[in-house]
Amino acid sequence: MDRVLLLLSVLTLGVSSQQIIENQRLFSMDATRVQHLHLLAQRLFSDFESSLQTEEQRQLNKIFLQDFCNSDYIISPIDKHETQRSSVLKLLSISYRLVESWEFPSRSLSGGSAPRNQISPKLSELKMGILLLIRANQDAAEIFPDNSALQLAPYGNYYQSLSGEESLRRTYELLACFKKDMHKVETYLTVAKCRLSPEANCTL
């Protein structure tokens, strides 16, 4: 009997170790994807700002600080302390919703250059990768159904033909919000991955 219990313990430990290794592998892949998107967002935003006159930059930045990104309607941690207290599944679910919210707006960021054309396919890969992590980390006590993602309306002027000044503002808004949201996702995935490593220090 003791030998049977010992064998079961060894088998259980082996399965648990395999799950941890697979989780770490999936997290590493998604971390690489979101890092690439965040760096790309920073570069595109920086390039766009560099193309503006100083006064245009000042005015657009002033307007942006008064506006909200569409994704601000997605409930997420308000600071680093709340982020660190959030469960792995909660951080993954919020990350999924943030990425999903860019599925359509990202199309207007594509075109014109090779880096821009990477945005939509990279977002799709990241979305699928996060979904795999959600499914791998779900349990009976905390389940986020696939249809729980908040359906956000597109940006107010997304489908409209705009004048030069309005088009400039929309592009600035999209790039700034995209950069902001990719930074959020990168932070949440970093904390979630760290949470699965008991010996790690997950302080932001």
UniProtKB/Swiss-Prot annotation:
Zn(2+) binds at H36, E186. One of its GO terms (molecular function) is growth hormone activity. SUPFAM superfamilies: 4-helical cytokines (SSF47266). One of its GO terms (cellular component) is extracellular space. One of its GO terms (biological process) is animal organ development. It is found in: Secreted. Disulfide bonds join C69-C177, C194-C202. Keywords: Disulfide bond, Hormone, Metal-binding, Pyrrolidone carboxylic acid, Secreted, Signal, Zinc. The modification Pyrrolidone carboxylic acid is found at Q18. CDD domains: somatotropin_like. InterPro entries: 4_helix_cytokine-like_core, Somatotropin, Somatotropin/Prolactin, Somatotropin_CS. Residues 1-17 form the signal peptide. It comes from the Eukaryota. Pfam families: Hormone_1. Growth hormone plays an important role in growth control and is involved in the regulation of several anabolic processes. Implicated as an osmoregulatory substance important for seawater adaptation. Belongs to the somatotropin/prolactin family. This is Somatotropin. The lineage of its organism: Eukaryota, Metazoa, Chordata, Craniata, Vertebrata. The gene is gh.
